[in-house]
Amino acid sequence: MYKRQVSILNALGMTANGAGGTTLKQMETAAGMSLNQLNEFLYTYRMSLPAAYKNCAVSLANSAWVRDTFRVEDSFLRACVNYYSAEVYRSAFDGSLVTDLNRWVGKETNGLIDSLLEQAPGEATMLYLVNAACFDARWETPYEASDIREGGTFTAASGARQTADYLTSSESIYLSGNNVTGFLKPYDGGKYAFVALLPDEGVTLEDYLKNLTGEHLYQLITGHQYADVQASIPRFTAQTELELEKALTAMGITDLFDVSRADLRAMGSAPSGNNLYVSSVLHKTYLSLDENGTRAAAATSVQVNSGSAQPTDVKTVTLDRPFLYMVVDTHACVPLFMGTVTSME
């Protein structure tokens, strides 16, 4: 389900320009398109983003952070710059890298995510490829004071009953699939929308996510029904930090993380002559939703290391238990942000 998310797709797209052989083929298969198609798609999508759309602001930024002793291939950097508008920084990869990279992420996410790198990397790390995405939008139909129900109950994944304030509204797009129902709530202008998916009673969010695929999400959203939906959304702020190696490996991208199999020679060469491979794909998100709208940000980094081989009736959807949310570009059917809410605390 992660492969369609814009921040992750940008970071992996830059990485793919340094890949070859089976490593590249696995990445192309997971993306569902060739490298050239991926580059063109992400370039075209980024260029289509308006500086401001109605009361919506959306931005995407990319950067490449290169160790000063790493012999990076010019063709790789050209692809990152030409297709992804990546800013390129050379660094000694000491303590200043942590400050500079995190400052860049903070600037590009309007301070919603203030750190991606916790400490200076070891000598084996040659490169970081980073994407930052930011979103700030107002609802198409604002909430009135009478639409806010304070002191409601949310049942957390742990079973604990927690207090939540609910935003109630009538929506017109209903989503329904195997073991899940949901709705789509548009932001001002209609290009972007908040999507909520609530697993059926008796189905945990964890179990639902195990079988969820990008294709299923696409079919769920594009196969929506028009209906009168009585929707209730809790006010919430969610922050997530995910290491995506396991998820990407499950999608068939295996060689990229294997020091003995990864083919990243088109990216450059380490001073030691050791093989390049990806040691980490870190993804952080922040999303805050209230009666005014939504503010969200995401940052994704790919760490490259060197190493020696190793219906029409009224529907009701009340988000009072763990649910999945997305902020979706409804024109391209691309999720900008995705996450889960399992607790109000």
PLM regions and their residue ranges:
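Conserved small/polar residues in nucleotide/adenosyl-binding loops
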Residues: 1-5
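Post-signal peptide N-terminal segment of secreted/secretory-pathway proteins
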Residues: 6-61, 65-68
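Short glycine-rich loop/turn motifs that provide flexible caps or phosphate-binding loops at active sites
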Residues: 17, 292, 296, 338
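Non-catalytic, conformational "gating/processing" segments within enzyme and secreted inhibitor domains
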Residues: 41-202, 207, 222-310
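Extended hydrophobic
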Residues: 129, 181-197, 310-345
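Short, surface-exposed, charged loop/turn segments at secondary-structure junctions
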Residues: 209-211
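Juxtamembrane non-transmembrane segments of integral membrane proteins
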Residues: 214-217
